[in-house]
Amino acid sequence: MLADLESLVRCESYSADHAALARSAEAVGALGARLLGTAPENIVIDGVTHLRWVFGTPRVLLVGHHDTVWPTGSLEARPWSVTAGIARGPGVLDMKAGLVQMFHALASLRTLDGVCVLVNGDEEIGSPTSRDLIEEAARGSAAAFVLEASGDRDGAVKTARKGSSRYEVTVHGRAAHAGLDPEKGVNAAVEAAHQVLAIAGIGAAVAGGAGSTGVPGGTGATGVAGDSAATGGGAGTSTVTPTLLSAGSTPNTVPARARIAVDVRVPTSAAQDHIDTLLRGLTPRRPGARLEIQNIGGRPPMEPGASAELFALASRIARELGQGPLRGIAVGGVSDGNCTAAVGCPTLDGLGAVGAGAHADDEYVEVASMIPRSRLLAELVTRTLR
């Protein structure tokens, strides 16, 4: 198992490097073929390589990704290493160890009939070319297990995830010479400053959950009393954050245009819809200015109800395997589990590696946890297929 992990970590797979992704897909496909006994279907969409294995009529979907956030060449500065039971390297936690655990778990089953495995190559950038594949597979499945890393260093699984929305607010003004006749212009930069404050005000209003929105933010509960928590900087609250701001063309011109990027995170679909209404209700503050508000993408939330039954089953199995009480937590980040849950497929996320530091220089995996996590997944799949 450790040798397999090393082979994947050494094969870099930056999301933006399609050639590297093709090499990674070949490595992951070879590993899966060796352990599952059959080669995957290679699906290339807009240059991005995804892998799919289908055994019989699928009832259980396993989801992972082979791309990472690490630019090609990162391995030189952050080489593969194992010291004192800790494995390090680019993407080791997010999520190459999860892929290794998944393949070994499936290899231990008596039969793979009813299993579908989908490993995409663009999760880290929002799954733009693979989302349809994931949702199509999820619609026909009784359960989806997502091999993202555990929710904490103790191996908690992820029972809820915030949804995300990205907006671009474009401010249209009118250009003029800043020295000769500035009064003839409509300053888009000044209007944008007003809008940034208005957007921040929406964020402050919704940060308390129900607050002034009338939409409960949630508490991070999973529907399984006593075993759940929230993490990730208020995983049960909505956030609205202006993130990027640009305006103008030259230093001596009244800006005719400005742009504001807005990041939205929500625990429920109702909150997502309500914040959409609030943002689309923004109005210009300066005469002559005009606003254009666009939702440019995102993912729906994975709400607690999507995972409740699977979490209860996983908890029972963990106890039977002597792995102690299994915790479920709600987290602020998104994954492809958001998409499987959104189409009505019961989903349990965070079944991958135990460690910490995803996307960070200190990313690591606890090697000793890999076999127990693989056993937990194997039993989950077996019982779900019954």
PLM region descriptions:
Residues S13, W70, A149-D154, T159, ...:
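Metal-dependent amide/peptide-bond hydrolase catalytic core
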Residues M95-K162, G208, S212-G214, G223-G233, ...:
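Acidic/histidine-rich catalytic neighborhood of metal-dependent amide-processing enzymes
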Residues M1-P90, T111, T384:
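Acidic/His- and Gly-rich active-site-bordering loop/insert found
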Residues R59-V119, I125, R139, D361, ...:
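Active-site metal-coordination/substrate-binding segment of hydrolases
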Residues E41-I45, S127-P128, V240-L245:
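Short gly/ser/thr-rich secondary-structure transition/capping motifs
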Residues V63-G64, L118-N120, F145-E148, T170-H172, ...:
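Short beta-strand segments
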Residues L61, A87, D94, A142-V146, ...:
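Short glycine-aspartate micro-motif
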